[in-house]
Structures are given as C-alpha cells and as structure tokens.
Amino acid sequence: MRSIIIASLVALALASSPAFERTFEPKTDYHYKFDGLVLSGLPSASSELSQSRISARARIQAVDDRYIHLQLVNIRMAASHLPESEQMPSLNSMEQRELSEEYKQMLELPLRAQLRNGLISELQFDKEDAEWSKNMKRAVVNMISFNPIAPRNEIEKIESSYDKEEQSEENTSFFTNEKTLEGDCQVAYTVIREQKKTIITKSINFDKCTERSEIAYGLRYSSECPECEKDTELIRPQTVYTYVLENEELKESEVRSLYTVNVNGQEVMKTETRSKLVLEENHSIKSHIKKVNGEKESIIYSSRWEQLVEDFFKNGDKAEFAPFEKFPLDKKMHLIKTITEQIQEVENNMPETSHFLARLVRIFRTTSTSQLKEIHETLYVKADKKIQSLMEHALAIAGTKNTIQHILVHMENEDILPLGQILKTIQETPFPSQSIAEALIKFAESRVAKNNLVVRQAAWLAAGSVVRGIVDYKNIRPLVREDKRELKEKFLRVFMQQYKDAETTYEKILALKTIGNAGLDISVNQLNEIIVDKRQPLPVRKEAIDALRLLKDTMPRKIQKVLLPIYKNRQYEPEIRMLALWRMMHTRPEESLLVQVVSQMEKETNQQVAALTHQMIRHFAMSTNPCYQRVAIVCSKVLSFTRYQPQEQMIASSYAQLPLFLQNSFSGAQFDFAAIFEKNSFLPKDLHASLDAVFGGNWNKYFAQIGFSQQHMDKYVQMALEKLESLEKESTTVVRGRRIQTGIKLLKELAQKMNIRARPATYTEKDAFAMVYLRYKDMDYAFLPIDRQLVENLIEKFTSNGKVQFSEIRRLLNQELEFETHHAAYFYEAIRKFPTTLGLPLTISGKIPTVISAEGQFSLELEGTELRLTVEARPSVAATHVYEMRMFTPLFEQGVKSVQSVRAYTPIKIQAVAGMKRNFEIVYKVVVPENQKSIVSLTTRPVVFLRFPGFSKFEYIEAEERTVVVPQWQQKTQEIEKVFNFLGLEVSTRGNILNQHTLENWLLAEQDFEVSVENKNRPAEFTARLTVGQLEKTELSQIKYNKIFEKEFELEQENTESRREYFNKMVKNIQKEQGYKSVISLKLEAPRDYTMNTELTTVCDKQVRMCQWEVEIRRSPILEETKEWTLRSQLLVVRPEMPSSLRQLRDQPHREVQLSLTSTWGSQKKSEVTVNAQLQQSKEQKKYERNMDRQFNGMPEYELLIKAARLNQINAVAEYKLTRETEQVLARYFDLVKTYNYWTVSSRPENNENDRVVVQLTVEPMSRQYVNITMQSPMERIELKNVQVPRVYLPSIAQRSVKHQLTEASGSVCKVQKNQIRTFDDVLYNTPLTTCYSLIAKDCSEEPTFAVLSKKTEKNSEEMIIKVIRGEQEIVAQLQNEEIRVKVDGKKIQSEDYSAYQIERLGESAIVIELPEGEVRFDGYTIKTQLPSYSRKNQLCGLCGNNDDESTNEFYTSDNTETEDIEEFHRSYLLKNEECEAEEERLSEKKNYRKYERDEEQSDEYSSEETYDYEQENTKKSQKNQRSQKKSDLVEKTQIKEFSHRICFSVEPVAECRRGYEVEQQQQRKIRFTCLQRHNRDASRLLKESRQQPLQLDDYPVSFVESVKVPTACVAY
C-alpha cells in the first residue's frame, strides 16, 4: 500500500510539471503593473523615511515554451520624505521626479530570458544596455522565477516520513537551492492551495549561499571574534517572495526585503525594498518585442560595474576599462576649486571641512594620471600651504593606483615634503593591489628613500601593509577564494632578499617588520629558521616572533606548533621564550596546549619565565573581553589545578590586563601591559602597552600599541656615561686609575692561584641595540632605532677634546621658529556592497574624515641658570564620523546616515620658566588671548537623504537631507543652557546632550552641544609658581606636642606610666639635637584677583625620628563665599627608637608610631578636626614575638627582629566640629563603603560621646591580605570583617634604610650556612666547607671588582671566617667573644670606624660589607651575599653559581667547565696553601654532597618569610654538633581533625615528617584536642593560622584525648 501511495505522489509531481511550465502561454502578451519602493531610515515607526518609488508597465511576451521577452514602458518616478506605511504610497502623494531621456531609453531596452522548470536560467540583454539598467530588469524577471515543485530528494523525505505523519495534499513545504537576484542560496518554499488560488511563499537563507555578489573593502584590520559573531552580526538581510496563482496563471508577485544594521544586537538603521507585479491583462501578441542577441548572463546580480571600478582603483590607467572617462576634467577641476575656496572661506576648521575632505577624496578616486598632473600644475602649485597639505593627504587617503603613483613621482622629485606622513596614510589604502605594492617597493629602493632613513622605513612598512591587503583571507569577495600563492611567493622573495642583504640589526628588523605587516602565511618556516638561529642578534630573533602576529586567526595551530617547543626549550634565551608565550596566548589556545604550558610553569627553573607565565594565564582567566570568553574559561580551569605560587619579586617580568567592557555588550576596550626582565639588565628587555578595541563585536586587536625593546643598550649607555665621567682633572684620573689597577691586580692574582678562567662578556659594543616602536591597527607604523652609532654621534656632538661643549648645548637650547602644520586623515574607512531585490546595490560604509591644523610660534631660551619656553599656538580640529546605508544608481541616490561631528578651536599661549638662584623655582603661565573665543562643539544627528539624479556628468547635485527626530531617543537627552563668568572668562554651554551613553544612542539621538570660552578683556593670565627652598638648620624645640595619647591607645594598663615617661624622655632628647627645615610653596594666580597660595613646611631631625609638616592654603572666595577660604593643617609623626636586637625590642617600653593631625578649614564657617593615631602591633602580631623563647643571634636574630617589629594595626581617635554640608558629604561616602562591603559589615546602635569617632584598622599579619575595621561613631558601632585587599606592606620599626630594603626585595641572594649553600638561582646543595678558603662568589669578568671567600675557623666547628676582596681592600671578619672582629688590609678596625670602610653593623652581632654592586652579610655562622638581580650574569663564579636565572647549570668549575659532580665543582674553588689543612677525608666522602630537589627545599637551613623552624637556629650551642640528622627531618605542626559541623585542633604541636621524607620510626602518644563549631569565627581564624605556624591553645578547654602515632625518625628516599 505504501509503495502505491509514494508512486502516486511521484506521478502527480511529474504530471504537474508541464502545467507549471505553461504559466505563460506561448504567443501571449502579458501586461503587468510593476511598482518598486525603496525606504531608508531608522527602525522606528514614528520617524520619517526617505522613500523612492518607481512605477512601470512590464510587458512579458511568451515566445514559446522556453523563452520570454520583457520590456518596461511608461516608467515614472517619485520620491519624498514620508512616514512609513504598510501600503505602497501612491505616486500622487509623492513628489514627481523627472527621468532623463537617456536613462528612460536605457530602461526601455528589452531582454530575453530562458525559463527552465519555472526558473530563469539565462538572460540576454541589448548590447547598448548598461549594467545598472540590466540589474533593474533582472529584478523584474526575478519576481517571476519560482519552482514550487519539490526536488527528488525532498520526495524521498516524504517517503521516509510517511509513517510518522500525514502529508497534506494541498500544503507542502521544502528546502532547495536556487539562483535568485541576490545569489545562489538555500531557499525555503511553502505552497498553500485554496480552491482555485495557490499562494507560494519563498524565503532565502543567506547563511547558506555558494555565490553572492558581495564586495567589502577596508575590513583587513579587524580580528576574528568567534564568540561575538552570533550575537553581533552587523548586517542582517531578510527576503520573502509571495506568488499568487489562479488556474496556474501568475496573477500577482510580491517581494519584500529588509536590510538592517545592528549594533550590540539592536537595529539602528534599515533599508527596505518592496516590489510588486500585478497582472492587468493578457492577449495574443499584436506587436512583438524586439529580440536581443547579447551575451548570455545569469539572473544573479551583475557586479561587473563594481569590478571595473575596483580594477581602475587598483591598476589605474593600466586597467582594461576607464569607468570615469565620461566625466570631463574641467568639471572635476571646477569642483575641486569650489571645494578649496569653501575651505579657505572658513578661518578655522569646521565640521564642513571634514565633509569637503571626503568630497575631495571621492573626486581624486575618479581621476587618471594625466588628469592628476593637470590638477597639480593648475591648482596645487598655486594653492596656499593649507590647501596643498589637504590635497596631498586627500590623494593618499584616496589610495588608488593613480593617486599613489602621482604622490610617489612627486616625492622622488621632492615636490612634496611631509613624505613620512603621506606614506603612513598610504598604508591604509582600501584598494591594495600588486601594482601599488610594486610601486612602493620601487620607491623604497629609490635615491630619495636611500638618502632619508625615515622615508625608506615608511615605504617598506607601507609596502608590507599593502601586501597584507592583497593576500588577506578577509577577501574583497567573501565567497570567492582566489589562489594567491604565486603572489605570496613573489613578495616573500622580495622581503627575504631585503633581509639577506641587510648588514645591520636595524635593517634586518625593518625587513622582518615588513614581513610582519604583510602577514604572509608561507613565511612561517623562514621566520622559524630565524627564531632558532642563535647566530642572529637577539633583537632580530625577537622581531621574527613578533612577525607571526597577523597569522593568529588564519593558522593558529601552526603558530602554536612553532612557538610551543620554543617556549618549553630551556636552551633558548628567557626573553625569546616569554615572547613565544605572549604570541601563543593570542592564538586563543585550546585546553590541551594550556595544560602543557602550566606543566612547564610548575617545573620551570627560570623565575622570570615562570612568573610571567603565571601572571599571563591568571589575567586571561579574569578577562571580560567577549573575544576571550572561551580562553578565560579554559585558563581558569587549568589554573585551578596548579600548585605553583609565584615568588615575591620587586623586579619581575609581568603581564596585566585592564578590560573595560559593559556587561551583555559587545563593545569596549582592553589595555594590555607586559614587561620582560632578565638578570643581565636593570632595564626591561621588552615593554609593551597596547589598546584593543571591540565595537559591536568587531575586534581591533592592537588598535594602538607602543613598545620598547633593548639588548645590551643599558651596558653600553653605562659605558658611555663612564666615558663622560672620566672627563675629570688629570691628577684625579691618575690617582684613581692607580687604585683601580691595584685592586684588579689583587683579584687577578687570586684568579691565577685558583686557576679561574675569566668569563668574557657575552656581548660587545656593536651588539647594543634598542628601539621604540608604534603599532596602529596591528600594523608596524614606525620605529626608532637606538644603536651604538647614534649614542656615539650624540657624545661626539656635545664633547670635543675631552671637554663638554656648552656652546653646543646653548645653541640647542636657544631656538625660535614659526610653525604651520595641517594634517588630514581617515581614522578608518570600511565599505560593504551587496545587491537588493530591486536590482540596486546597497552600500554600507563608515569613515571618520578628520582635519587638524595648528599654527603659531615656538621659542626656547637659556640665560645663565634660567631656561624659558614660550609656545603660542592656534590649534583647530574637525572630525566627522559618517555611518550610512546608501542605495545608489544613476537614476537616484537614497539612504540613511548617522553623523557625529566634533570641532575644537583653542587659541593659547604657554610660558614656562625654570631657574635656580637662591631657591629652585618653576613658573608656568597659560595666557588666553583677548577677543578670541575657544570653542568645543559636538553634533550628532541621524539623517535621511535623497539625490535626483544619482549623479551628473556636469555638476555636483546637493542631496535633499532631513534630520530624523525620534521622540524615544530625544527623551534620553537633556537641554542645557548656561552662561557664567569664571575667573574673568565668559563660559557658555548650550544645547542638548545625552544622559544615557551607549553606542546605539550615539548613533540615533540628535545632539547639538557647544562649550565656548571667551575673553573680552585684556589677555587672561593663569600662573602657577612652584618654589622649593633650600634645607635650613632650625631648632626642634618649636615642635609642640600636647595631647597626643588617647585612652584607646593604652595597650597594657600596668605599663602606661613607664611608656609615657619613656616617650617623653625620647622626644626631649630628640629636641636637643639639630633640626632641619624645608619650605615648598605653590602660588596660583588667575584674572579677577583670584589667588591660591599653598605652603608646606617640613621640620625633621637628622635621623627622621620626629617630623612635623605644616600646610597652609589660602584662596580667594568663589561661588557663594564672602570670605577668604583657608586651610591650616599640622601633622606630627614620632617614630620609636630602632631596636637592634630581639632583647631590646622586648625591653623597649614604647614601640609605637604616634601621629597627631590638627586641621581647620572653611570660609565663613570653619570645620575643625583633630586626629590622634597610633600605629602599633595587634595581639596576634605580639604573640609572634612572645613565642620566641630561645636566644637568637646574628642574621637569624635580625630577620626575626624585622618580622617581630612589624606594625599591623592603626588606632585613631578623631574629634571634630564640622559644617553640616561637610558632615553630609562624609556620611554619603561612608554609606558607599558599607554598601560595597555589604556582606562583611555588621553594625549595632550605641550611645557614645558626641563629635568623636574611634577607628581601629587591623591587617592580618601573616597573609597581609585581609583587613578588619572597627568604627565607633556617636550613634553606632560598625565592624567590617575579613575585607580582602591586595597584599599590604607592613612597616617595621627595625627596618634598615629604603636603599637596603630595595636591595633585599629586588636582588639575588646566595646563602652559605654550615655545609649548606643556596645559590643565587635558588639551588640548594650540601658540600663540606673546610679550614681552607673556598671561593663563595667572585666577579670573574676580565676586569674583576670583588671576591668573597670563606673558611671554617677550625675543624668540626660551625664558625666561619670571611674574606672580602673589594677593589684595593682586603677585609677579613670573624666572630670572637660573641662579637664580630674586622681587619682591613691586616689592620684591626673598631666598630665606630666601620662607615669609613663601607661596613655597617646589623643588629648586635652581624655586619654588612658593601660591594661595588650589592652587599655581603656575615654573623660568624652564616654568609649572605646579595647582588642586584641584573648583576654580572654569566660572569660570576664560585660556590654561589653564576646568577643567570637558570637552576639547571649552576655547577661550572673554575675553568668554566660544566659538571654534575658537586665534589669536582667544590674542589675547583678551594684555595689550598700552607695556612690550612685540606681535610681530604671529608672532601672525599660522597655523603657530604647532595643536591636538593624543589620538594626537599626545607632542609636544616632556616626557612624564609612566615614559617620558621626555631629548633635549627641556635647555632651557638655546642650540642648542635651532636644533633642527629634524622631529628632535623621532623617539624612540629598543629594537628587538625575536621568534622561536618566542627573543627578540632591539637592543644600542643605534634611532630610530622618534612615534605619529601617518610616515617622510619614512630610511637604512640596521647594527644589532647579542643573543638570549635565550624561557623565560629575563631575556628576559621585558627585554621588559617595553623597553616603558617603551630598554635598555642593551652587556654582552650580539652574536648577529647586520642592516641596518635607520632614519628620519631624520618628518612628521605
């Protein structure tokens, strides 16, 4: 039964075909009424639209079963601005438009069409017909092209679905592919039969097209954003056909198409086309339509005209056809002359100026080479400077082959001067072609370019950018894939030849930047060869990595395949690896690749590489950039599984992102910053700061980027500065030279004794290179190379015969010139064209024509010690953003556009004077000229426009424009009109401006806002005078302190009196000493006798223990004030004495920092506030010091002292008397803080003292990332608990100077203790030290500066002797009678004389010896050598390693040979002589040598930061020599047991094996536990503290006792 039904359906389908083929009966003349309507406007029902209607009678003659003829007659046109309606407006309701006879005759030419299965398959037109006319006729026959019969595959689907549902015989629906006017796309048919009438509906799926006449220009600068594509599709076309048949005869055909522009998912513009064919009559043929025999063409819209225009733009006069030759030259010249005259009529740049620029660009694009030559000779040569400059830039913006060739010819003749600017504009040509690229390359090799490095650079970079446009995958025709391999190979050969011919680093980098701008995918292998070739200079290899940036979208996996091995290979330089990671992350890698990156990070030996990797992945994980959504999720996932924690370093490679994106919006910006450091340089190796922009889902990667890169330049600059420094008196040079030579001799003799081979520098002067580069729209725009030759030229210029030439410096600093400059540009231009169902092309374009001008005078004068700068300028700028949908045809032009214009004109005069007489003084003066107006205006408006005819050969036709006012958007603006006098200047603000700022609002709302500043009196001067006084001696007795303590500051009641007495005595002793005073004043003056004076007076003692700052500000009354406004404020800070030992810290009664602030301010009414504050230690921090029940000495004591002396709590009491307004403002700000921390705030009402606030702020001392704040106001008590903040720096009252803090934080440290050494690169190993000197660290360069040696005082002792050879001095130190004894060149020195020898005491029993770079700390048992992180990379030797940031190559022997044998390594640095015994037995025992892996790093050295194994620190006691190694492998921790609702802690610490060790022996012990509810705040606090140190819980009740197995010995396998 089923097969019979299916066969019947097939037979029915086949039977119906002939009937359908006879829709048009042969030998019959059909007369249809054709109506077409175009609507352009905003997507608002209430707004007006520009509407154009075309009406005609369409005669269709069916010659036979296959062919029809079509002719349009009685063609009429009308157009008006009308509100939208569903019905097609009548012709009488619109303004009638005249059609020229030429165009009417063109439209009346007939066509011949072939019908196959109801579809138009072939078309033939008259040979005289024009392309635009053909396309309009295609639109008519397109309305009769349909085939409602399902194809065979659809019939098979009917069979497969028969069992599932019944099929209606009347109604069918199916999909098929079909050629229509808009392309070869998938269409959906729905057929509904109603008695005698059949209604057929057809719609087009534009996402599934194989052919479409679409063209795009200027899109090559955007990157792919896959996450944005679905939600931010910019253009959404919709087309629906409706056919009505009666008795198989076509009675009516209608097609409606809607084309919308969308921003952030909202429609902002639309163009709609409606076409309708209605059968009026049919009869036998009486007069035949002329048969045409033109070439056979497709029904798909013909873009031949667009292709001819494009070919002309790209190839110029060599194009096959000149599409604009009909337009006479004299008319073009007349238009150009008219435009330039209109520009000149306006004194300053106005919004119209930018429109005139756009018109100039359009005209120049239509010109031939001969026409440009005539324009140049007739108009350009005779024009003034501004017009000439605008014409030059307009030619470059036009970007056609003819305009570019014209510019290049005149550049070679040196007729055009701003060569670099013009070439930069050519980089952005929207019509890149092979001929343009070849012309640029030819110019780059010309004489002019070779003589001017700036021009040569600009030409090559422009050539690369043009090549990118040619080969870019974002094709001009999206659905057409051209094979461009031959072109790619040709240009790659040219660029690689440029690279091979390069002789300098700069030339090689220029060649690579050219390749990078070109974005050639076939260049990957060549670039990879350069990256891995270590013979190439490092800057060249880095640039080769950067040259891969444009391939991240086209071949991300290939880039990852190239860069991942480079990142993972530790043999490559760290900066190469970090740049490889940087580039790889921008390919949006998959999880599988990121897992490998994280794995490498966890085992990475280079701290800089590991730190940058962690920061980069972390910031990508937090990114809100919509284009990185997938990457952010993956980065978060892989980061959650890593155990890696970056070390705290002050100078570390870093990466940061600042994404600024609105939620649920695909627009915003992202700022990226990256810095790459390495140990051989104190300057960053690379710095990048970039801005990415996303507008409506269009991603502009590297919209702007500035960067700095250098290699060895810091070394060379340092050498150059030393050369300048050497220009001293001859005698001084001789003496100093002798001393240096003596010191070097000592160090070289030591090297000879120990057979140390000098480590030559890995760089030479010629390797020094640096560059600053600018990147715009992902193109290398310009870069400035800085090499050895440039530095030498500068030195040579300003020195002569060993002396600085001050005359040259004065000549440089005494200049006077006048300037006039004009610049024009398109900040972007993007064009998309596609067909509509009326046969008219729709163009969607955007551009920002901008004109900038500035003229004035500049002078620089140097007189004695005074430098004077004067700039008088009159800058003006006009920019207009035009975004439009435009329907263009010779008959008419119609569309809608959004226009945003900005204009600014600000005449100004600036004077700056800097001088040093008695005081240092800077005077900065801004002068507003009299009778001149400064204006900043903003105008935005949506506009619909009509132009009839579309263009004329003989004149420019103005468009009929109408501003569209949409009430719903006007409600989002506010009217402002205000005029007021500000400091003698009349300021007026007028117009309306948006109060809700979104991109769509800016496109749709009408705004007209202007701010003007006018000076009608004499020139208005605004002066700022900064005076810095000299340091003067003063008496400290003038500092008064009265009530500085509050009752809330009392820490322990029983010690209050002694603490007060101690503090008062300390202050009185300080006041007896000499004080110093400095005064800084700032005076501001403005017209109308407005002044503001600020004076800051600082008084401090010599050691900065007590300081007082006084600020006094006075200013003239403003607004409603009637009296002078004043502020008087005094801040007193007293810090406690600096303890030198833990014992002194414990015994010191006063260890807090006291602050007292008194301030009074106001005009008629005064506000007063007095704040007393105390910076102190919290209870938790004090507990840290109290738990230290052992005696420490030397460096362990000092380091513990620093931590124990940290202040982590502030108590402040404020008594105030405020005005009502001030009190309300402060209350609002505090409410904001409470709201922001809503979940962590608790408050309760209290009745406290009026006009008094008590605040306590406590920083959690261990992690330093959580803050508790308690505030007590007159009416309430507020608490903020556990507020997370960035890691806080806690001051320590025992801290050394800022200089030493920086050295500690940013330097590399090597530590030697007992028989254990931790190297500069953080490698920990054991080696036996003996009574013979071992070389700890030495400068092993060819000109050494220091050496550090050490030996044991005697066998089996832990005490050591240190010897430091520093230049010409030999310093020996050792511990004797619990005090460090120091000898310099064999002579004992006393501690009071240390400073003369650059030695400093550290605590009570340690010293610091300064080195030429860094320092050495010694306490008799431990040696810590601290060097700057950049110091002597690969030129250090000794047991501390080479300080190269790599932990895998530490063991280089004295003869510079790498070894894995630690014994061999140690013996090479052993200095044997008759004074010592070598202890061969200890040196030969292998058990004395061991290298620790990372997991075993906690050994018997004391650990860093918060955890501290006190048991290992008391190195003074003799019993330490018998302490077993197994015991040292134990550590005590608080044992924790967690349950569902409670957490239990062991009351006393329990022994555990260290990480990396396993239990060897154990015993049962009964352990007491105390339990707390899990929700208890103390529970979470104790849980956190237990991770840092054992807890003391003796005061807590015992909850239960449990038997626990406790290890007594551990072993490492």
From Swiss-Prot:
Tissue expression summary: Expressed in the intestine of adult hermaphrodites.
Acidic residues bias locations: 1495-1512
Chief location of this protein within or outside the cell: secreted
Listed Pfam families: Vit_open_b-sht (PF09172), Vitellogenin_N (PF01347), VWD (PF00094)
Annotated keywords: Disulfide bond, Glycoprotein, Secreted, Signal, Storage protein
Stretches the record annotates as Disordered: 1491-1531
VWFD domain: residues covered: 1308-1477
Highest rank taxon of the organism: Eukaryota
SMART domains: DUF1943, LPD_N, VWD
Effect of disrupting the coding gene: Simultaneous RNAi-mediated knockdown of vitellogenins vit-1, vit-2, vit-3, vit-4 and vit-5 increases life span, causes accumulation of neutral lipid and an increase in lgg-1 foci in the proximal intestine; however, does not affect fertility or pharyngeal pumping rates. Expression of transcription factors pha-4 and daf-16 are increased.
Sugar-modified residues: N1268
Leader peptide range in chain numbering: 1-15
Ranges of residues in domain Vitellogenin: 24-687
Claim: Cytoplasm is one of the keywords in the record: no
SUPFAM superfamilies referenced in this protein's UniProt entry, alphabetically: Lipovitellin-phosvitin complex, beta-sheet shell regions, Lipovitellin-phosvitin complex, superhelical domain
GO CC terms of this entry: cytoplasmic vesicle; extracellular region; vesicle lumen; yolk granule
A Gene Ontology molecular function term of the record: nutrient reservoir activity
Disulfide bond sites: C1310-C1440, C1332-C1476
Subcellular location: Secreted
Described purpose of this protein according to its UniProt entry: Precursor of the egg-yolk proteins that are sources of nutrients during embryonic development. Together with other vitellogenins, may play a role in modulating life-span, acting via induction of autophagy and lysosomal lipolysis.
Name of the featured protein: Vitellogenin-2
UniProt lineage: Eukaryota, Metazoa, Ecdysozoa, Nematoda, Chromadorea
Encoding gene, per UniProt annotation: vit-2
